[in-house]
Amino acid sequence: MQKVHVIAHTHWDFEWYFTRQQARVQFAYHMAEVLQALADNQLDSYLLDGQLAIVDDYLQTNPDKRAAMMRFVKARRLFIGPWYTQIDEMVTSGEAIVRNLQLGHKLAADLGGVMKVGYLPDSFGQGQDMPKIYQGFDITATVFWRGMPHEKNARYFYWTASDGSKVLAANIKNGYYVGVDLIENDDTAALLHRIATDTQAHDLALPVGGDQRAVDFNLKDRLQYANQQTSDFELVEDNYPDFFKALSTSSDLPTYQGEFIDPSASKIHRGIYSSRADLKHLYDRLEHLMVDVVEPMMVIAAHQGIEAQDGMVAHIWRAIARGQAHDSSGGCNSDATNQDIYQRGVEALQLAESVRDYLLRKLASGAPASLNVFFEAHQRCGPFIKMVRSRWQRVASIFHLKMKMVKSSRMKS
């Protein structure tokens, strides 16, 4: 008998063919249902789509619900994180992916705990370095849907990166919405045999939820009905961390390496790689400005006694993270939504440029004569700001060099 771990969840794009403002209104009412279902024990647990952006928006307008959320998070009944937004891996830089996870982890920890599962149920293809990135955050398991080719057809497997990093992966081949049939269709056998294909594992995952779907308050009744209809499967309410703990005892799981960007089993929407190039250019420019210029300058400034503006940096990275959600970065949205995305990017870029310009003026005009910091050049480097002081002028120049701080005597003029 195989064990089916039934996982109640929502998939909640914070913007798509609807605007962020429309989504915020609907999510506020959805959270009322979630908290009620958990308080009344109509659900054992619930997954908020693995992202904190929707929670961030919700708590801005519903701060009185923070305590209730924290109570359920700490009790391992409400699962949040590890992401800030549900990114697209193929049009997002590696640094932005890491920052997205950092932000998601921080906010989830502040609310009581982060779900240590790399949960990306709708990202349009899977990057080859994701196991490496996940291991850097002590994430040992991942859930995704899109990109698996027919020749690599295992539902559950170990996914490795080129450096040997490994995570246990669940490919939800039938989509994150497959479990809706458990609620709306009495043909339980057909559903269970569908999710049992391409695996010999004893433990199976059955996600129950969908895009902006209302809470299924009758889940327990439907589980009872399903268990009465089958002798081949046992269905239990569960969550992804406990599912992976059970799955990890399987001894016959295959190992795959590399990226998964094949549309043979699920759509990966290749058109999003080039659609709305204006958005992609804007956010790419913003990412590079932060990573290659603003943050290095802030380090230099801090060395000279100029206080770092960590809150401002975090604010800009929040805007970047919202621009890297899979629909937002893909530009596959309504015109109104794309206008919102573009305007957020413009405002964040203006803020980043203002930080850069201020620090440049401050450093160029006020660097002490005894400035004792310089930077060595290395190959394979990114740009940084090198401050050159001479007897007659102070010049700020951008070189394509790697930043490395070393001790030095006073620079010669």
Range-by-range predicted roles:
Residues M1-I385, Q393-S413:
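Catalytic-domain carbohydrate-binding cleft regions of carbohydrate-active enzymes
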